[in-house]
Amino acid sequence: MTDIGILPAPAIAYGALSPMLIMFGVAVVSVLVEAFVPRGHRLRTQLALATVGILGAFVAVVALSGSHQVVMNGAVAIDGPTLYLQGLILVASGLALVVMAQRRTVAAVPSAVGAGAGGGLDSFAAQASSVPGSEPERVLNRTGITQTEIFPLTLFAIAGMMLFPACNDLLTMFVALEVFSLPLYVMCALARRRRLLSQESALKYFLLGAFSSAFFLFGSAFVYGYAGTVELDAVARAVDADAGERSFLLLGVAMLSVGLLFKVGAVPFHFWVPDVYQGAPTPVTAFMAATTKIAAFGALLRVLYVALPGITTDWRPVLWGVAIATMLIGSIGAVTQTDVKRMLAYSAVAHTGFLLTGVAAANERGVSSTLFYLAAYGFSTVGAFIIAGLVRSGNADDGADGDYKDDDEVTDLRRWAGVGRRAPVLGIVFALFLLAFAGIPLTSGFVSKFAVFEAAAAGGAMPLVVVGVMCSAIAAYFYVRVIVVMFFADPVEDSGVLRIPGPAVTVSIAVSALITVLLGVAPQPLLDLVENLADFVT
């Protein structure tokens, strides 16, 4: 009788995988909370569970510092970039999650600056499936019932994002991509106000995201056809040996790039960014704008620097073109916007171009500068979107009738006139984030742009540096324009007001602002750290 071979199961390195296992475990428990915990106790339970999970995963990341190994039969790499990016994702997620946890009921109506004490700011529908203004929604609003499904969705997204930059083979990378993408599609549709716009943006994101994921999977198949493997280090060895049909490799890399460049929001795969950033609930926008970019750039760096260093001369010119187009279209597109969230979305596209400048440097300094830039940009982005979500129309509305027009978010730049003068502290902090985006000295943005430009120049990519400096000058215009409107324009009849944030949200804003200033005034400790960590395990 012939023995049937048994596929060996991979040895699970629980210690090395502990940050991701903690987040996946907490996400599963969060689903059980939704099923079994009474509705009245879910919010506190979910918030406590998420807090414990994020803190536990962060402690596990710190405990693994210095680890340099490949586990799960080559599927997952635990090294400096992995742990650094996982730490960034956890901290940025924690800051955004605080805002997601804000809830209000009919009895707790938020107040405008100068009009009394502040309250919670609820950005999420009581029941996303109900028609806006319908009787079921009115009943839910009157009873103070709020949905908490956002917590398990967010936790699964965080877990997938932590796995994404750690993946050492293309199939695991695809699974991680879907694990964090699918919750984001749903989260974008949960807005309490402007529900149809929110659902439209989610549908666009889902359709385009599915399309890009198909390209990624198809590209993985072509790379496998070339190398006979999907492990990144084995692909690199096959490339060095020129072991297969080169056209398969180049076509596969092109398709992989479509999937990855879509996630970072690079031109020409950026069209979803303005619509989704505008339509999604602002706390979700803050979360995804920072963490998705961190995770996706980590995966892009690993693919290019671990699997494809042997064909740098092939992918580098293409990346140059993508970076230049992304910087130009992002900067010019932002100038034409009159909606603050869409302006910040085009700003995010431009920053993707700056980050690609560091990636295209194709040297170790390019990796370290990109890692630094991700930290600087991530925290400024979270803080900026949190404050943007606090600008509301002037009259508080209890929402008992299901109509929240009187407490809608104000994103029309014209209606931001005088907002900074009416709430000077929050206005100054928001101006700080905008100046950091512009790359003004003594902010994190200046140091991060200088770092990627220096790396690109050292790698012989001076055209990218020239375009980057030019686009930074263009960007300064639209950032300063917002500041001028906030502080120097006379208020209009329907000007918005800044709601007073609660203590937890205030802490999130303060932490984001503090990091933005520290990375601009004293960046050397983090620069030294990323230089020591910029070494991928192979």
UniProtKB/Swiss-Prot annotation:
State whether keyword Nuclease applies.
no
Q: Where are the transmembrane segments?
A: 12-32, 47-67, 81-101, 144-164, 170-190, 205-225, 248-268, 294-314, 317-337, 343-363, 371-391, 423-443, 472-492, 502-522
Keyword hit for Zinc = no
Alphabetically sorted, this entry's keywords are: Cell membrane, Membrane, NAD, Quinone, Translocase, Transmembrane, Transmembrane helix, Transport
Example GO BP: ATP synthesis coupled electron transport
Q: Supply one GO molecular-function term.
A: NADH:ubiquinone reductase (non-electrogenic) activity
Membrane topology listed for this record: Multi-pass membrane protein
Q: Give the enzyme class.
A: translocase
Q: Give the catalytic activity.
A: a quinone + NADH + 5 H(+)(in) = a quinol + NAD(+) + 4 H(+)(out)
A Pfam family recorded for this sequence: Proton_antipo_M
Give me the Gene Ontology terms describing cellular component: plasma membrane
Places the protein is found: Cell membrane
Write down the InterPro entries for this protein, in alphabetical order. NADH-Q_OxRdtase_suN/2, ND/Mrp_TM
Family per record: Belongs to the complex I subunit 2 family.
Its biological purpose is as follows: NDH-1 shuttles electrons from NADH, via FMN and iron-sulfur (Fe-S) centers, to quinones in the respiratory chain. The immediate electron acceptor for the enzyme in this species is believed to be a menaquinone. Couples the redox reaction to proton translocation (for every two electrons transferred, four hydrogen ions are translocated across the cytoplasmic membrane), and thus conserves the redox energy in a proton gradient.
The entry describes its oligomerization and partners as: NDH-1 is composed of 14 different subunits. Subunits NuoA, H, J, K, L, M, N constitute the membrane sector of the complex.
Protein name, please?
A: NADH-quinone oxidoreductase subunit N
